UniProtKB/Swiss-Prot annotation:
The gene is Tnf. A lipid is attached at K19, K20 (N6-myristoyl lysine). Residues 57-235 are extracellular. The soluble form derives from the membrane form by proteolytic processing. The membrane-bound form is further proteolytically processed by SPPL2A or SPPL2B through regulated intramembrane proteolysis producing TNF intracellular domains (ICD1 and ICD2) released in the cytosol and TNF C-domain 1 and C-domain 2 secreted into the extracellular space. The membrane form, but not the soluble form, is phosphorylated on serine residues. Dephosphorylation of the membrane form occurs by binding to soluble TNFRSF1A/TNFR1. One of its GO terms (biological process) is animal organ morphogenesis. It comes from Rattus norvegicus. Keywords: Cell membrane, Cytokine, Disulfide bond, Glycoprotein, Lipoprotein, Membrane, Myristate, Phosphoprotein, Secreted, Signal-anchor, Transmembrane, Transmembrane helix. Residues 91-235 form the THD domain. It is found in: Cell membrane. Residues 1-35 are cytoplasmic. GO terms for cellular component: cell surface; external side of plasma membrane; extracellular region; extracellular space; membrane raft; neuronal cell body; phagocytic cup; plasma membrane. This is Tumor necrosis factor. GO terms for molecular function: cytokine activity; death receptor agonist activity; identical protein binding; protease binding; receptor ligand activity; transcription cis-regulatory region binding; tumor necrosis factor receptor binding. The chain crosses the membrane at residues 36-56.
């Protein structure tokens, strides 16, 4: 073999070596990318499974027995307070309107779906609080009428007569009018209905008196049970 041939072979070998090295590097790069993609997909799949089956992640949302979530801190607080005591020994009252009373709102406890328990009492149309504590107070009324010969303004109020300072104060109140201020003369006398619901949580003292009143009892619809009521629940 001549010297020129040997030199030519060496040059060809030097030219082929970078190509082989480049091909090897490309193969390694593809292998690394493939491995990284596989690990990424596997990790995401594993994380999804763990979250889906509740192995990791935040605690599941608490729910009421009827399936409604506890969406407020107040509801969570009330639930914790209620569960910390035996509900059977808590003061509770639910009174209903006397449908035989004419043009007045009289509360009765000796009726179906009404009760006084664990120290609660009804005296002079007022509920008597038996012990200091946090109480849920609620009341609903339903007004009805026929047409609007005059401007009608309806009010519904829950009040507390505090034993500590001997004064009656309003705890909850609502005002509504079923009629426009200006009723056209000769307008058709259409029937109307106006419900009002009040509810709130209050710190009460033993001996406090609670009352639920309306300004125009003649418009009350008390023909059906469950439409007008007043209640207190210790929390």
């Amino acid at each position: 073999m001549s010297t020129e041939s040997m030199i030519r072979d060496v040059e060809l070998a030097e030219e082929a070596l970078p190509k082989k090295m480049g091909g090897l590097q490309n193969s390694r790069r593809c292998l690394c990318l493939s491995l990284f993609s596989f690990l990424l997909v596997a990790g995401a799949t594993t994380l999804f499974c763990l979250l889906n089956f509740g192995v990791i992640g935040p605690n599941k949302e608490e729910k009421f027995p009827n399936g409604l979530p506890l969406i407020s801190s107040m509801a969570q607080t009330l639930t914790l307070r209620s569960s910390s005591q035996n509900s059977s020994d808590k003061p509770v009252a639910h009174v209903v309107a006397n449908h035989q009373a004419e043009e007045q709102l009289e509360w009765l406890s000796q009726r179906a779906n009404a009760l006084l328990a664990n120290g609660m009492d009804l005296k002079d149309n007022q509920l008597v609080v038996p012990a200091d504590g946090l109480y849920l107070i609620y009341s609903q009324v339903l007004f009805k009428g026929q047409g609007c010969p005059d401007y009608v303004l309806l009010t519904h109020t829950v009040s507390r007569f505090a034993i500590s300072y001997q004064e009656k104060v309003s705890l909850l109140s609502a005002i509504k009018s079923p009629c426009p201020k200006d009723t056209p003369e000769g307008a058709e006398l259409k029937p109307w209905y106006e419900p009002m619901y009040l509810g709130g949580v209050f710190q009460l003292e033993k001996g406090d008196l609670l009352s639920a009143e309306v300004n125009l009892p003649k418009y009350l619809d008390i023909t059906e049970s469950g439409q007008v009521y007043f209640g207190v629940i210790a929390l």
